[in-house]
Regions:
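PAS/PAC sensory module
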Residues: 2-4, 9-18, 23, 33
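Topogenic membrane-insertion module of multi-pass membrane proteins
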Residues: 46-97, 101, 196, 200, ...
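PAS-family sensory domains
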Residues: 27-39
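Intramembrane alpha-helical segments
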Residues: 61, 131, 137-229
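Membrane-embedded alpha-helical segments that form the functional core of polytopic membrane enzymes
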Residues: 87-112, 179-187, 231-250
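Extended hydrophobic alpha-helices typical of membrane-associated regions
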Residues: 296-313
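Functional transmembrane core segments of multi-pass inner-membrane proteins
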Residues: 207-256, 260-262, 274
């Protein structure tokens, strides 16, 4: 098998790897022995295994944590739904632009968080991470999928593109959409970046997640459709914000040890795992209580109560 390796001088060199089975004195197979020999007539690029397009696609899905963009889609669709409920026409084109801008902002937040968690050492010393990427960051740097500099570049490009895509939204909806986007950018970037490190501020990080992925994003989506800041859209985002905050909150539990060692004072670190368990129940319950209250007081149709069935699952 041919591949490239890093020598003691940190140079990439082309190699041939020979693997042979090893046996004990009685002839039983007990393992394998690998011998690496340098190939002198080829370059590292010629011997490096080819990576398929699907593998590359999956790699970038991991780096940018694309499956978690649902946390952006839900409040944006909710805001558009509220606009429709209030009698405003909904433009699918503007909805698509809003989703694109929000997704770029979310990707920039994900990758910048990975970069600064790497710089602080939080993700590097975290051995309780999940394979699903729910906690411990995307692990893209730790797995060698991309360099720290590469992640920082992806974050910068994503944030820059979100600003460019946001220009037509500002032209259509006015300066209020700029302030909402700017708030989302700053709170996303400085969630783990110094000097603010919002995620280390004993609950401020969790609060900002709930606000951004709940009321503010829903209100911003409705603002693009209507040109108005609708209180109903803000209210519709409250249960969504509680649920997104709950997802982040519960996945801070396995990060407790590494977060504590690096001074990342999340609510789990601040309260301790035992007391913090009640916080998850409170967030989850608050989401469904808020739905019930807004349906009962007439803010939203009584059929909204059907959403309570999701609590069973």
């Amino acid at each position: 098998m041919n591949d490239s390796k890093i020598d003691k001088h940190k140079n990439e060199i082309p190699c041939q790897i020979k693997i042979t089975p090893t046996k004990d004195n009685e002839g039983n197979h007990i393992g394998y022995c690998g011998v690496t020999e340098r190939i002198h007539d080829k370059s590292p690029n010629e011997v490096r295994p080819k990576i398929s397009f699907v593998t590359k696609l999956f790699k970038w899905m991991v780096i940018m944590r694309l499956p978690f963009l649902s946390a952006t889609f839900v409040p944006i669709f909710a805001g558009a739904a509220v606009a429709s409920m209030m009698g405003f026409p909904v433009s699918w084109t503007w909805l698509g632009i809003t989703l694109f801008a929000g997704s770029l902002l979310h990707i920039g937040t994900n990758t910048s968080n990975d970069y600064f968690d790497y710089k602080s050492g939080t993700d590097t010393i975290n051995y309780n991470y999940s394979n699903e990427g729910l906690n411990g960051g995307s692990r893209s740097i730790q797995m060698g999928l991309i360099s720290p500099k590469g992640v920082a570049i992806v974050a910068a490009i994503s944030f820059s593109l979100s600003a460019i895509v946001g220009i037509p939204l500002i032209i259509k909806a006015g300066l209020n959409i700029l302030w909402l986007g700017l708030f989302g950018f700053l709170s996303g970037l400085f969630y783990t970046a110094p000097p603010f490190n919002f995620s280390s501020r004993r609950g401020l990080g969790e609060l900002l997640i709930g606000l951004n992925f709940g009321p503010l994003m829903a209100a911003g989506s409705a603002l693009v459709q209507t040109g108005q800041l609708l209180p109903e859209a803000f209210l519709a985002g409250i249960p969504i914000g509680f649920l997104i905050a709950a997802v982040v909150y519960i996945n801070e539990f396995p990060d407790h040890d590494s977060d504590k060692r690096t001074g990342k004072n999340t609510l789990i670190v601040t309260l301790g795992p035992e007391k913090a368990r009640r916080g998850y129940v409170a967030l989850f319950a608050s989401a469904f209580i808020s739905i019930a209250l807004m349906a009962i007081n007439g803010t939203f149709p009584i059929l909204t109560l059907a959403a309570l069935a999701a609590a069973y699952f």
